[in-house]
Amino acid sequence: MAAKAVDKLPVTFGSFVHQIPEGFYPGEDSTLPASVTIFPNVDLGGPLIQMSGVTGDGMISVDMNNDKRSLDFSYSSNYPLAPRTQPIAYMGKISIDHQYSGSGWNTEGIFNLVSAASLLGVPPSSCSSTSSSNASSGSPNLSCSMSHPQSDLEHIYSPPPYSSCNEIYQDPLRFPCGSPTAASLPPPPSYPSPKGASDGGMFPMIPDYSALFPPQCQRDLHSDRKPFPCPRHPSPLSTIRNFTLGGSSEGPRLASAYSPQNLPLRPILRPRKYPNRPSKTPVHERPYPCPAEGCDRRFSRSDELTRHIRIHTGHKPFQCRICMRNFSRSDHLTTHIRTHTGEKPFACDYCGRKFARSDERKRHTKIHLRQKERKNSATAAWRQHVARTSLKPQSGRDRQPCALLGPAAAHWDSIDPNRTG
């Protein structure tokens, strides 16, 4: 069905949107849809009406698919346009319900806003492509788009004048330092320049700086200098752990003049408590005698002899890292460090008291053992005394009346315990 076209139909935009005429809502007996009331020259189910744009004189050009003639709507706005400080392009879709709902006009279906967007800097080509795509749809809708000249937006939203990423991320070596002392300083190290953007990536690849950071203890050193070790002083707990695992935690090595082999063997100032006490190990099983004069000690292992010789030489190779006290034996240093750390790994089995040394716990345990022995001896003596007094026969003259039984005790005394029946 061809639509009737009118050359120009004056429509007031303010009255069309804000004010609704009195005859806008038909009565109960009205049989025509509201679209005919608004657009009397347009048939029901008409073709798609497309508003391609707004001209400079405020005319809206309407194209009809079946009729090649153009239908222009002229409107005059009652509200003055505010001066625009920033060009804005609006694009939206307004669909008018063309189906007759029956009794009256559907107030909710007057204007169905399907989509609306406020786009900044949209060229006219995008608006025309949007309107052409809307024209191919089957439902009668009305597409409107307003655009502004693109030249007004170019000076506001113009991209930066960068041609490639290499110009954005420039090599800092191209700009040498202009300070007056730059000539006296050594040349800066040569950093590998990043790869260009022509390798296939938009941004340059991150250069590899692994060669600039050597391992620890060699950082910030020139190539002509030799690396030096970085020793770390062990903590007291690590020293105890080294002794437990059999490691060496000796202090700095003494010079060759102060080595144990060159130290004189002095006699022991404090003699043994029991010098004539025989050893439990036979002599043939102790092949390492003490070389000191006047010392008849023999040992079954060489490390025991080495430890014994330190008594004669006074060599103390084990030093405490906290108080710098020296010890001749590693176990003595281990127990000494526990006085600083407060560690007490040895607990008493009887009272639970803790000690830092095993010999202290052993000495404390002997106290409990002696107390236990005295208690056991007292208990045994009491039992012997009770057994001795209970089995001793008493004569009638030695019997004393019972204070608890009183007069009844005479009856029990008259009974002969040896009598039967």
Curated annotation (Swiss-Prot):
Q: Does the keyword Cell membrane apply?
A: no
Query: Where is there biased composition of kind Polar residues?
Result: 236-247
Tell me which GO cellular component terms the UniProt record holds: nucleus
> What's a Pfam family this protein contains?
DUF3446
Q: Where in the cell is it found?
A: Nucleus
Q: Where is this region: Disordered?
A: 127-152, 179-200, 223-288
Give start-end positions of each zinc finger (C2H2-type): 288-312, 318-340, 346-368
Give a short account of what the protein does.
Sequence-specific DNA-binding transcription factor.
The protein's name in its UniProt record: Early growth response protein 2
